[in-house]
Structures are given as C-alpha cells and as structure tokens.
Amino acid sequence: MDSHVLAFPIPDPSTPPPEEASLYASKCDYYESDIYSQIRRLTEEKCIETEKELPVNIKLHVKHKGMSISSSRNELVVTVSGNYKNVYTAKIKILQAIPKILISKLVLEEPLENLLFDEDGYVYEDTMKHLDKITEITGAKIYIMHRSMCHDIDFQLRTDSGFSNRLNEQQSFYQRHLESTRHEFSCQKNAENSFFIVFYGDYCSVEHARIRVLALMDEIRGLSVVAIATSVSFQPILVGKAFSSTAGMKATESINIYTLPFCSDSIPRLQTLPALNSSKIIITGEEEKLQRLEEAFYYAEEHLKLFTHVTEISFVKLFEFLAYEMDELRLIMEENSSFIRFPEYFKEGGETSPENSKVKIYSSSIANSEKTALRLAKLASKYVQGKTQFGVEDNEDFLRVAGSWRRASTIEKGVSSSELSSIVSSTGSIVETNGIGEKMSFSPLKKLSIPPTEFVAQIAIICMASGVEMLLKTNGIEYFGQENTVPIAMDKASKIFYKFGQSQWHQILLEAPTKDQDFISGKKNGKLDKVKQQCRFNLKNGDILFCPQSTSIFTVDIYSDELERVIKGMNTMLLEFPAEMHFYVPEEIHKKLIGFRGEQIQRVTKLYNSYIEFSTTPFDCYGHNVLIRTPSKFSENLWAVRSLFIKTAEGLGYDIPKYLFAN
C-alpha cells in the first residue's frame, strides 16, 4: 500500500494573563507558568505512545525552541508516516490528548461589582474563597481584572452561550453585547470603570467555571440555586429558545437558567484535571418558582418527542469544529433547540474509517433539525480543501469525463461514487458507465514514484508557515484549512515539488448549503458562467463544477493546470456566496415597505442588489421577521437596507427595541 505523510498543527495554547496586572488570581496548580512547554511535553509523550500502538512513524517539529507563543503561531507540527488509514487514526489519538487552552471573560455589571469589592476597592475575602473553590472543582484559573488591563488579551469565547435564556430577551441581549455596545447605550463612563472576570483553561473547565460564577453572583444577590439532573443530550433541546418558551420553561426576570457544555465527552482535557459532570441544568431564582420550574423540566423531559436528522460532514472538518468551533456549535444547539451527536470515535480516540462522518441531529421539531443542519453546513463552508496532482501528461484523458480527477481520488480511498459506478480493469485503466449504461474507458492518472517520507521536513515547514493540514502521497498533495491559508500552502508546495512533474494540476473544493446553490450559480448558471469567463476557464485548462455531496451540502469543484487560475476562481466564487441578515420590523408596516404591487420593494432590491423576504412567522428564535440576502461582494448593502427599514418604521411612530435590530 502506498505510503502517506500527514502533517497537522497542534492547537496553540493561549498565554495566561499576568497575575501582577490582576486584582485577584485564584490558586491553580494545573497549568505550568510556561504553558507552551507543558503542551509540548504532553505532545511528545502522546506521539511516543501512539507510535508504539500503530505501524507509523511520528515526528514532532518545533518552530522555535523556547520562543514565546505570543509572537509566533503554529509552534508545534506533527508528521505521521504510514498508510492512509493509520495516519488519520494516529492523528485522532494524538489530538484527543492535547487540550485547547483558551481564555474567556465575563463582564461585570455595576451592581455585581458592588457585591465583589469592599469600599476600599479590594475583593472580599469570602469571594476569593468561593472563587478558589470553583477553581479547585473545575480546573480553570480565575482572574479579576480591570478593563484597562485586558486590551492585549485574546478572548476566544463568546459571552452569551450557556445562558441564552437568562432573564428576558432584552436583558439577554444586553449581557451578550455589554462590552461591544457601550458607546451605543451611552455608557462610556461605566465602561471605563468596568471589571472583567477572566477564565483560563480548556473549554470544559472554562465554561463550568463561568457558569458556576454566574450562579454564585445570583446566590450573593439572595437567589436560591437548584441543580436539576438532566441528560446532556436533552439539555439544549429543553432550554433552547425554540422549545423552552412553548413548554413554559422560559427564564423570567426572577429566574435564570444556565447550561453546561453539551459535548464535554468529545473534548480533550488534561488528565490531572478534576472530572466534570455536565449532566445537569442550574437554575436560580425564588424558591417557590424554582420548584414549579423543576416540575416543568421533569414533565417536559418525560413527554419530549425527538426528531432525528442525519447529515454528513467531512471528518477533517469535525476535528476543526471540536478544536475551534465548540462555542459556535453550542450556540447553534441553544438557538435551535437541538443536540448534535458526533461519531463515537471522537470520544474513544480509537481506530476509525475517515469516510465515516455522519452527524446525527436530535431536535424538538423537523424544522429545528433542518435549521441546525443548515447552520452546520454554513459553518463547514468556512473550511476548504485543496489538491495538487503531479505528472498529469494527457490533459484530454484527464478532462474527458467531467470531474474525473475527483472520482479518481474517491476510487483511491475505496469510496464508491453515487453518480457513476467505477471499476478498475486488469490493465489498470478505469472503466466507468455513464447515465445510459454505456462503458467509457480512460487512462488513470500517472503514479509517480515520489517517496513521501523523504519530504517530511518540507511539508512540516509549510504546515508551520500556513497552519494548513497536508497529506503527501506518491503522486500528489492534499490540503485542508481556511480559504485564506490553503492557497498559500498550495503555492509553497508547488514550488518545492515542481521537479516531480512538468504538469501540475490543482484543485480547490468549496462547500456550501444545497439551498444556496441556485443563489450562487445564478439564473440559468449566469453567475457561474461569468466567473468562468473572468478566470478564463475552458475545457482544456480546467473548469468549475457543482457536485452534490449530500442532501444538505454541495461542493464547488475548481480545478486547472494553473494554480493562479484556481485561486482566482476560488476568490471570485466566494464573492458570489450569500451574505445575509435577519432583523425585526413590525408586521403592520410590511405592506407599506413592499408597496403597491411590490413596486417599492423592487426598487430597493434593484438599488441594493439584494433579495428581501418578509414573513409573518419569525425566521429564528429572536423574533426576526425580515431576511435580506446579497452576494458577499455587496455585503455592506445589508446594513443599508436594514437602516432604511428601521428609519421608516421609526418615522411611522414604531419603537423597535435594539435587541431586535439584527443578527
């Protein structure tokens, strides 16, 4: 079997805030002062352990020995040599042992500040004891810092997940955007005197500590605190915005509902950290109301009807989700009252087939499960795949069947195509049957004898420079990363490996929700044809194809013999991807905005090159009933249309709350 070399970066840990700049720092022995050295040592140990378990060769590459990670990213890169299945199994085992260390914050409102500090501005001793206890239970280090000392800190988590139902909608919005909208609410004076509670650790530890601190603040205010034992998979469904209000479990001004991380069993943590239990919902409020709410929870859980939706997402993208998108995944679940279950191998870290990437969505309604699948598809579209093929000599055979390269790579991995049935003949040529059953034969891509193991250092350097995951095979390279990093890696690799083939074919795969396909391609493929014309694609030098991947996702396949043309095609296609906005306008003035026979709204859509839809039922859980969509190249028009409609509503005497403005 052909040898492969897989290079992937280890998530960089965040630098902890300086204790000398904080008003308080909890006692925590779980993280070393040099967190980079701790992660590096942990990675080395896991690489040695994995190399003993699997028939692979593993090397750990360090960019700068002793260099501070604050000045350089992608410090650690692991390369694994072996067959296709083993290199990805090794990757799973290694990444499942390396936690992503990050920083989160909680903005203290003025009433809360008075509960934590005495008249002289010092933190109460009892408060420090409580925070030290939370650190001991969760494993997250806690700081109290003045806002002026937090400018250089890279906060990597949202401040709204875990309590989307906290208080009422207006108060929830205020909590989520307290820091970013202080100027809008004319609170600059308070902003200069505000304080942050900063949390440092892995995702689960940080989120458990943050929710416990919120419950502690409520307890200091005199509210009762109750923990309700609930299955993790039921929590986002029961307390999500799309279900809780109809079940009578929505938070009020006197009741707060907090949820813990839903996918904690799939997220790596340090072995020395205390075990955490996410199977509970924390509610705070008046004791009598909490008792009624607790009964409502048990009743809803017993009579809950679940709907299941299965979608497929590349297993490589699922890794990125668990490493960098956990907060967004949690928010998607909360907003759509759904639970996303990942494949079991993410929990076990064992051997798996990389093609097994089915994700199950459980929700309270079919509509919510479909919305969740759509949000996942949009999240997946942030990441792109690239390929470089060496030694392709016969361009006509390569292009004879549309997308033959894509199918050839599918055959190589042992995956059958849904559109064409393919077999490999005894002579090594590929035989396909077209839609009417006729056989079509063409020559396979030439296999070069490139020894991948001799170029481990080269792909490790490219991986460090770009942060892109790379897979080197005997006749090509595969890339995975974001749209701004994959072209960089492809360019560097093509220059290093140019000697292995005068003819290099390049390919970039973009993903998008199936419902956006008509929007991206345009009427009668007008937008697609225009992009091909701008980038000078023709049958001989490449093409852009739309290929269905699953019921919810399709792939934009861009390939050519010139890398510059492929990159230009990718950038041009991304400008045609939709940008959208939801906001609220009173239903009473919808007809006025539309105008007689739609003349008014048609003028607006033509002026701002946008699609506008009004609805009597909200598009999301925030009550927004207006949807605007436009190509990404005109994304600034979204705000112009929103401003026009809001001003029209206010001119007619309607007062629209700011928390319903846009999302």
Curated annotation (Swiss-Prot):
Subcellular localization: Cytoplasm; Nucleus; Cytoplasm, Cytoskeleton, Microtubule organizing center, Spindle pole body
Keyword entries, A-Z: Cytoplasm, Cytoskeleton, Meiosis, Nucleus, RNA-binding
One GO term of the biological process aspect: meiotic cell cycle
Matches recorded under InterPro entries: KH_Mug60-KHD4
Chief site of localization: cytoplasm
Keyword Cytoplasm annotated: yes
Pfam family, one: KH_Mug60-KHD4
Reported function: Has a role in meiosis.
Identification of the protein by name: Meiotically up-regulated gene 60 protein
